[in-house]
């Protein structure tokens, strides 16, 4: 795991009020050799803001990042699967034409060794051996695949123009069967648009769509474990609106990327010692690192919070739009036969407010933090097992509780994998040398045969 800070400037002519920000980090490259991994990617950002004339404007931005991560004593040959999330983001109007963006990126890199365990099987004829059984996991396949999904959403009749479309992909289930990996999930989509009234009031439409993708994999093994990340390539997301008898229909194309590593499990029977009564032998022992997938769990969780706007003179009149664009897991801790998962979901909310001091109404926005803590049951864990976790949004609902308070209720999907790193010493080679000299013991026994005296 590693954290990186990133800054960028976004051109936003005549900006006055930031209304909504959707930022999606995508890891485009994760490879290396020895003990270093190079990661590269982009943060796609879309900013909806109100300019000094009261016009709603949208700007897009791409900010690149790169880093080198020291993973220690990794295997000579390895594949890696990386995930990156925004653990914090801050936007502010730097000048009349520029918005300053500050990101904090969290990287989580899983390294899968491609070197096979070196061992001698327990069929060495003429040797006295001490066998042992070791359960290990092996990398079967790792790849990045591109695919696309398309859906339609009915926006209704009161639509002037679409301003923003943000979407996140959530993996719900992964299975390996035959020579294929099946990835199932949902796309959570939120469209912000202007209405046809004189004030160009904002409105939004949220929708959820199922997706299912199958990919061919090498060295398939039924019941294998799979580690999967799915991204929406936000810079290429397309929305085409069609007016059908006065009602607006939005056609949305989602270019997507799936990164996966498929891991199988096998039990090997090897030797921890060997000796011979007839020959001189040379035994080579090798200490080897192996890993084993202990278990995994996918579970949906309900989370909620209550937020109060900071300005005392300001009251909430109407909520226009809300969506969760980012969830950061701050803690994954083993607690007996369970995993304690803690984190924060960030919800962007656009609403109309009234200021009693100025006696003016206007659009404003907040990013509300929804903290959560839950325990997921997972048996057979050791205290030093490694937990690989991520969280994705499923749905969110925001309602006005009082004039200055909002209730937020959301559902998120938690994906937890437990991996155990093991070190074992196995006999990796046996060389049989010269025959030992015949026995010259001082005491001999002679057994009298039948008919002898």
Q: Language-model features: where?
A:
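Viral structural modules
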Residues: 1-453
């Amino acid at each position: 795991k590693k954290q990186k800070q990133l800054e960028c400037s976004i051109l936003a002519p005549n900006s006055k009020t930031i209304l909504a920000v959707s930022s999606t980090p995508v890891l485009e490259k994760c490879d290396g050799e020895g003990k270093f991994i190079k990661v590269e990617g982009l943060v796609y950002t879309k900013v909806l803001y109100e300019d000094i004339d009261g016009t709603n404007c949208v700007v897009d931005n791409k900010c690149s990042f790169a880093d080198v991560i020291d993973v220690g004593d990794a295997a000579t040959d390895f594949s890696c699967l990386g995930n990156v999330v925004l653990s914090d983001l801050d936007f502010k109007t730097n000048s009349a034409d520029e918005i300053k963006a500050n990101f904090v990126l969290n990287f989580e890199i899983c390294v899968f060794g491609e070197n096979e365990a070196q061992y001698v099987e327990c069929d060495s004829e003429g040797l006295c051996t001490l066998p042992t059984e070791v359960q290990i996991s092996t990398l079967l396949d790792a790849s990045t695949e591109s695919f696309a999904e398309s859906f339609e959403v009915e926006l209704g009749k009161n639509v002037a123009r679409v301003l923003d479309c943000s979407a996140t992909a959530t993996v719900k289930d992964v299975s390996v069967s035959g020579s294929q990996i099946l990835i199932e999930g949902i796309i959570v989509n939120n469209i912000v648009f202007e209405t046809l009234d004189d004030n160009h009031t904002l409105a939004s439409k949220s929708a959820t769509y199922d997706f299912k993708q199958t990919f061919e994999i090498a060295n398939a093994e039924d019941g294998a474990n799979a580690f999967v990340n799915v991204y929406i390539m936000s810079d290429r997301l397309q929305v085409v609106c069609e007016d059908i008898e006065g009602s607006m229909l939005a056609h949305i194309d989602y270019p997507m990327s799936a990164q996966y590593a498929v891991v199988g499990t096998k039990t090997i029977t090897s030797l921890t010692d060997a000796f011979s009564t007839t020959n001189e032998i040379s035994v080579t022992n090798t200490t080897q690192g192996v890993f084993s997938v202990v278990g995994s769990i996918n579970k949906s969780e309900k989370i909620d919070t209550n937020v109060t706007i900071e300005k005392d003179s300001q009251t909430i009149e109407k909520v226009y739009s809300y969506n969760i664009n980012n969830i950061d897991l701050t803690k994954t801790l083993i607690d007996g036969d369970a995993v304690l998962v803690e984190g924060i979901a960030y919800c962007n909310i656009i609403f109309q407010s009234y200021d009693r001091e100025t006696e003016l109404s206007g659009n404003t926005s907040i990013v509300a933090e929804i903290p959560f803590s839950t325990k997921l049951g997972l048996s057979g864990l050791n205290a030093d097992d490694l937990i690989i976790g991520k969280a994705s949004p499923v749905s969110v609902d925001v309602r006005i509780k009082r004039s200055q308070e909002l209730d937020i209720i959301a559902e998120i999907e938690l994906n937890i994998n437990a991996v155990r790193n093991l070190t074992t010493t196995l006999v990796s080679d046996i060389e049989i040398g010269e025959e030992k000299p015949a026995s010259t013991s001082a005491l001999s026994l002679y057994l009298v045969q039948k008919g002898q005296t």
